[in-house]
A protein has these predicted regions:
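Gly/Ser/Thr-rich helix-start
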Residues: 284
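Active-site substrate-binding loop specific to GH73 endo-beta-N-acetylglucosaminidase modules
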Residues: 1-281, 291-326
Length: 326
């Protein structure tokens, strides 16, 4: 069954759903971010369709033409581009007789520039585009997406009421526990506001868990473009230290490549893939990472898509049925 193209395509779409790639189609972008394209090519829906095709091709190449390992979705340096995407994301190289694309209808495999430090799905432009605002990155959207969906960490609880005086002060980069305190910074960038969220309650409890996952991605802008300075022209430092209860608790890392390598070593990616596939199989999101049923499947898989799919389908909680006509 796994050799059937339709089955492979369905599993590819499950993976795209794991990363919420479909959210890309509800996003708008500041047109200044696509100024490298000719006026005729500056078609946001067209670019989004290109990015979706690119990511489908990437996932398919890893899972069915490559190693088949889930971990490689996070570490591969491959990207698929047509002429428009190659223009929008410059520096991609081609090898093995592959030439740069010359049309928007043909996608070819290329390799990201090593200097950009990209790493698999987390730096595919479609993923970054999906989890960003029109003109700036969203540390909250990216961080929550990685925490909840990519790493399958247990829910953090309900969001705080941002209309409260203490929350307003935090969002103004001001210590809410000190009467008459002045702002800690100019508070005019995503990073500076994130600093305050991770420092002061009532925001700290959740954002100290979420924001670090996004801050390692700060070198990649709202459309997945590589950059070395942020929206205010300040140098980017993608170094973070992960707090207790994170799978990487106590670890200090710089950049997304070191981040994904640490995730691979921890086993959390394979673990989350089981949870995501099982959620799809039973038609209901499994919110808790560690359960007896899911943990049993985790011990049986070898990290490949074929093993993952087979072991989830054979799990007792998937095969068991109650009620209905036999």
């Amino acid at each position: 069954m796994l050799a059937l193209p339709a089955v492979q395509a369905n599993l590819n779409n499950i993976v795209l759903g794991w990363f919420n790639i479909g959210q890309m189609f509800s996003k708008t972008k500041d047109t200044s971010l696509i100024a490298a394209l000719s006026t005729a090519e500056q078609d946001l829906p067209g670019i989004e369709n290109d990015l979706f095709t690119s990511t489908q091709s990437f996932v398919n190449s890893v899972l069915w033409s490559g190693s088949g390992k889930i971990d490689d979705l996070f570490t591969s340096q491959t990207v698929y581009v047509n002429q428009r995407l190659a223009t929008l994301y410059p520096g991609i190289t081609y090898s093995g007789g592959t030439k740069a694309p010359t049309s928007d209808t043909t996608f070819v495999a290329g390799t990201w520039p090593p200097s950009q430090g990209r790493s698999g799905m987390l730096t595919q432009p479609s993923y970054l585009w999906s989890a960003s605002d029109p003109a700036v990155n969203s540390i909250v959207k990216r961080g929550k997406g990685v925490h909840d969906n990519v790493l399958c960490q247990d829910p953090l609880g309900s969001p705080v009421d941002l209309s409260t005086p203490s929350a307003k002060l935090v969002l103004a980069c001001t210590n809410p526990t000190v009467a008459g305190a002045t702002p800690d910074s100019t508070c005019d960038s995503e990073i500076l506001i994130s600093n305050a969220r991770m420092t002061y309650q009532p925001c700290k409890t959740c954002h100290s868990q979420m924001d670090p996952y996004s801050r390692v991605l700060q070198n990649f802008g709202p459309i997945g473009n590589y950059r070395t300075v942020d929206e205010k022209g300040r140098s980017i430092d993608p170094t973070v230290t992960f707090v207790p209860s994170s799978p990487l608790a106590g670890t200090t890392l710089t950049g997304v490549q070191n981040f994904t390598q640490a995730l691979v070593s921890s086993g959390i990616i394979d673990g989350c893939s089981v949870q995501q596939m099982a959620s799809y199989a039973i038609g209901s999101a499994i919110q808790k990472y560690s359960t007896c049923e899911i943990d049993a499947v985790r011990t049986s898989t070898d990290g490949t898509i074929k093993s993952l799919f087979s072991n989830v389908l054979l799990a007792n909680f998937v095969r068991a049925r109650a009620g209905g006509t036999k």
